[in-house]
Amino acid sequence: MKVCQKYTAVLLVWLSAVVSMRAGAVDLPDFTGLVERTSPAVVNISTVRKVGDDSAQYYFGGPEQDQIPEFFRHFFGDPYRRRGPQEAQSTGSGFIVSKDGYILTNNHVVAGADEIFVRLMDRRELTAKLIGSDEKSDLAVLKVEADDLPVLNLGKSSELKVGEWVVAIGSPFGFEYTVTAGIVSAKGRSLPNENYVPFIQTDVAINPGNSGGPLFNLEGEVVGINSQIYTRSGGFMGVSFAIPIDVALDVMNQLKDTGAVKRGWLGVLIQEVNKDLAESFNLNKPRGALVAQVMKGSPADKAGLQPGDVIVSYNGNEIGLSSELPHLVGRTSPGQKASMKVVRRGDEMDVAVEIGQLPADDNGVASVPAGQTAPQNNALNLQVRDLTDEEKESMQVAGGVMVAQVFPGPAATAGIQPNDVISSINNKDVETVAQFHEVVEKLPVGKSLPVLIIRQGNPAFIVLKLNNK
């Protein structure tokens, strides 16, 4: 009897543990219903590019492939693969957004194409017309003529939360209607050379061929367009990026209405604020976008912005990282008034600006070595010289001093290099060698001091600290 009671007690404990584990477990989502509802409106996109020898040249990514950095690659298949005339090859994905046949995809999927073909899940193959494309956002709008087209519901990427489940459907490596799932890893990611898109980062498996396909939330609404991956192998490594559908809709509507996208323009070059820069500009913590240069005649110039200003808010949106500012400005309509909060020498102020239209291109500047050097006899241990008139014109600056030689000391520790141009020190303009020595002689010791330099045509602030002698 005692033995039975003993085994009964053990059995009850074991059953209790099993029930407890089941109660604590979280059921994984079932994607089957979502996939069945949405797949018919996902399409496979093929392109043909005609070449001089009457053969066909097919692209996974367009003619700009060689210019795209290895670090963030668009999705390409076998580049520059030749086939017979008019032979098509799968290049990417897209999805239907309206009953009258409008389709969203990536610009790099259709860039350089002479003909575009769309294949639906019901095996219909249609010729698509390119309505418009936008390289800066990597988006393109196509249109097909057909009846009874399935359409996807569009969600709001602004309501997407980190940790939320998301699903991708596309044609990786030509395997049509492949379904992968994961979670939102981060929002508002800024990628190199992609200033105007706050990307959604996910761990959804994305590979060549998924490009242009939809990213769904659990309600089956499109919240993003799969666009890029981080890879060192050419394939998926757990980091994928999607264009928010809110951004895509704005671009699509402009392309449909006018065939082009107008973006707001402020006319500043900005950089990140680190701990040392925050201290030198009297900020309580690293935040905002530090203005390194104000372009002459730009909206920022007309509004009175200055190098050294830190933009901490734009139209009520707090700027934590400098990368958050460009896409906010870009989505502001040209001619619209915008309000900013700016910290200047430790004091916060309100600045109103009328946003301009982003120019088609943005030319850089270059420096030309020349001129006479001044002896190294200053607290920074630098040898500097005046800029020539040709250098000033080339760099579009009123003045500054060129660093001829750097000796061990505070400037070397701060990272100043030969051929750097010093424009200001501790928020004091430096236009000549004489001004340079005058400013340096009055620098306080033991404090973090901002120094504005121009290096290879690019302005940037660095932090200098003079130690007690």
From Swiss-Prot:
InterPro entries: PDZ, PDZ_sf, Pept_S1C_Do, Peptidase_S1_PA, Peptidase_S1C. It is an enzyme of class 3 (hydrolase). Residues 1-25 form the signal peptide. It is found in: Periplasm. The active site is at H108, D138, S211. Substrate binds at G209, N210, S211, L266, G267, V268, L269, I270. Keywords: Hydrolase, Periplasm, Protease, Repeat, Serine protease, Signal, Stress response. PROSITE patterns: PDZ (PS50106). GO terms for cellular component: periplasmic space. It comes from the Bacteria. NCBIfam families: degP_htrA_DO. Might be efficient in the degradation of transiently denatured and unfolded proteins which accumulate in the periplasm following stress conditions. This is Probable periplasmic serine endoprotease DegP-like. The gene is mucD.
